[in-house]
Amino acid sequence: MRRPFRATPVQKDGPRSNRDIRVPRVQLIDAEGQNHGDVSIQEAMAMAEEAGLDLVEIVPNAEPPVCKIVDLGKLKYQNQKKAAEARKKQKTVEIKEIKMRPNIDTHDYEVKMKAAQRFFEEGDKVKVTLRFRGREMAHQELGMKLLQRVKEDTVEIAKVESEPKLEGRQMMMVLAPR
């Protein structure tokens, strides 16, 4: 015999309001922001109905809980706007990659370093990748010297997040802005 389907109870998001508030007494703040002190829940509900608004629990952990008479829809909308604004202001840190060869020319090196400096100013991490081709693998010390030079040139604006290491035919190092 099958068990009957039982739906999971719906979890309400946001603060408790109106009949969901199950405490005998609350500290009440009305729509104008005036504190009415410690009142019974029935009295608070009556005042909220009289104003045509909702009784919303603002600070549930207080003793007694702090409730405010506000429009619940408006409160939820304002909270959503605040959350969206906070998400918009968050900066995601990207890892930008700069590719070089061990026998890079001085001007090319300077151009790459200017690009790295711009990335650090924008708050991004930089992954410096050195690619070895053919017989260049026999001279890995040149690559190590070049990465040490990059580290020394960016010491004021960046810190080394991962030291230079060889992976296959590539040597790489990650720098993060200070």
From Swiss-Prot:
Example of a GO MF term = translation initiation factor activity
| Record InterPro entries | T_IF-3_C_sf (IPR036788), T_IF-3_N_sf (IPR036787), Translation_initiation_fac_3 (IPR001288), Translation_initiation_fac_3_C (IPR019815), Translation_initiation_fac_3_N (IPR019814)
Location of region: Disordered? 1-20
Q: Which GO terms of type biological process are on file?
A: ribosome disassembly
Tell me where it resides: Cytoplasm
Q: Which domain of life is it from?
A: Bacteria
Its predominant location is cytoplasm
Q: Name the GO cellular-component terms.
A: cytosol; membrane
Q: Which UniProt keywords apply?
A: Cytoplasm, Initiation factor, Protein biosynthesis
User: What is the recorded function of this protein according to its Swiss-Prot or TrEMBL entry?
Assistant: IF-3 binds to the 30S ribosomal subunit and shifts the equilibrium between 70S ribosomes and their 50S and 30S subunits in favor of the free subunits, thus enhancing the availability of 30S subunits on which protein synthesis initiation begins.
**To which protein family does this belong?**
Belongs to the IF-3 family.
Q: How does it assemble?
A: Monomer.
This protein is called what?
Translation initiation factor IF-3
According to its UniProt entry, this protein's organism is Brucella melitensis biotype 1 (strain ATCC 23456 / CCUG 17765 / NCTC 10094 / 16M)
The gene it comes from is: infC
